A protein has these predicted regions:
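Active-site metal-binding loops of divalent metal-dependent hydrolases
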Residues: 23-24, 66, 116, 153
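Short aromatic-enriched loop/helix-cap "lid" or pocket-rim segments at secondary-structure transitions
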Residues: 14-15, 32, 140-142, 159-163
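Pocket-forming structural segment of enzyme catalytic cores
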Residues: 73-158
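Glycine-rich, phosphate-binding/catalytic loops in enzymes
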Residues: 34-38, 76-78, 129-130, 165-167
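Flexible gly/pro-rich beta->alpha loop and the following alpha-helix that scaffold active-site loops
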Residues: 1-60
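Gly/Ala-rich beta-loop-alpha elbow adjacent to hydrolase catalytic centers
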Residues: 61, 65, 70
Length: 207
């Protein structure tokens, strides 16, 4: 990854929006302990966010993406706000209920989570859209079109299990626990958090 330039072919005017997903990396890892790949990826994501904020490119950054966004805005992450693998209740704020990405979600909905660190304070120049008991900053908006989400709306129960399996070396839980969580989550009728992705695409897409 340290050899890949993700922005080499990126032109702001050619895209409707950008999705930045999670990763096994922890932003709060001391700089001296980060791999070259992690440092390069973080740098590339920060550069992309800078372009997006300057050019008005819509972005939805989830998990690791939110943590890099918070750091870019001057707010650190902490293991104090990590969440164990499982389902948690997400509470939409008043600003969130007025936002097009969350407007059709209930005031409280369940999402699958599992992250070592989180953001404890709302970063400067951003609006808090959603929160949870153990992780105060679950979703923010910066400006009109850059979003960060600690939960991963792109992951339904099946994809959540695949992600945990792929990141098993990073300490994301044992297979038995994941199987139980996924079984319980799959019993619900709808992947409610997935509406965030759908609404992002619908609201910002253009030909």
């Amino acid at each position: 990854l340290e050899e890949v330039d993700f922005l080499d072919a990126f032109t702001a005017g050619d895209v409707s929006g950008v999705l930045i997903g999670g990763s096994p990396y922890d932003v709060s890892t001391p700089e001296g302990s980060k791999t070259r790949s992690q440092m390069h990826v973080e740098e590339q994501v920060r550069e992309l966010l800078a372009v997006a904020l300057k050019e008005g490119v819509p972005v939805l950054a989830t998990g690791f993406g939110l943590e890099v966004l918070a750091g870019y805005l001057g707010t650190s992450t902490s293991r104090e706000f990590g969440e164990e693998l499982g389902a948690t209740e997400i509470f939409v704020t008043a600003d969130g209920r007025a936002d097009p990405l969350l407007a059709d979600l209930p005031q409280a909905f369940t999402a699958l989570v599992g992250h070592h660190e989180g953001v404890g304070e709302v970063p400067a120049h951003s609006t808090l859209l959603a929160s949870s008991p153990d992780c105060p900053v679950q979703m923010i908006r910066v400006g009109a079109s850059v979003y960060g989400s600690q939960f991963n709306p792109e992951l339904d129960a099946e994809r959540f299990a695949q992600r945990v399996s792929a990141y098993s070396d990073a300490g994301y839980g044992d297979p038995g626990l994941v199987e139980t969580i996924v079984s319980e989550a799959s019993s619900t009728s709808e992947h409610m958090a997935g509406r965030v992705i759908r609404n992002f695409v619908t609201h910002f897409s253009h030909d």
